[in-house]
Amino acid sequence: MEDFSTQLNVLLVDTFNSILRMEESMLKSAGGANLSIGEMHLLEAVGKGDPEGCTISSLARERSVTLPSVTVAVNKLVKKGYVEKQRCEEDSRSVRVRLTQQGRRAERMHSYFHEKMVEAVAKSLEEDEKSVLLKGIIKLNDFFSRKSVSQEA
């Protein structure tokens, strides 16, 4: 039998890749074929932000990417019609990014996909298995969150 580390690595990679494939398939079948997974997750970050809009800086922090990368991605989403940019009245150097109606539709579709995915997983588990799974994933998430923060410092 494989050792724990090897088995865990295979499961993490396979699970991550399976979720990405499912998301890509969902995007294509729902008419969002012109969105990449990264763009979809950026829309999700914009949607979770301030209703008045998010700044490029806050999006970069949220997504753990550089300002230039977010700027390029936001500009692509503007061209595709998913977000709009507006200069801040208080600080003309700052830009706020908001979802358009098309962006809100795509973000709702993505949220619905995640709801259905979680429901399907939960349906196959007993209550004690759900509890164990949550505890394990919470620890896993805490570990990766700490690693992410320590690597940024």
What are these language model-derived features?
Residues 1-3, 128-153:
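C-terminal regulatory/oligomerization modules of transcriptional regulators
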Residues 33-36, 52, 69-72, 76, ...:
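Short glycine/proline-centered loop/turn elements that form peptide/ligand docking sites
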Residues 56-57, 68, 75, 95:
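Residues within helix-turn-helix
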Residues 75-135:
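Charged, amphipathic alpha-helical coiled-coil/dimerization segments
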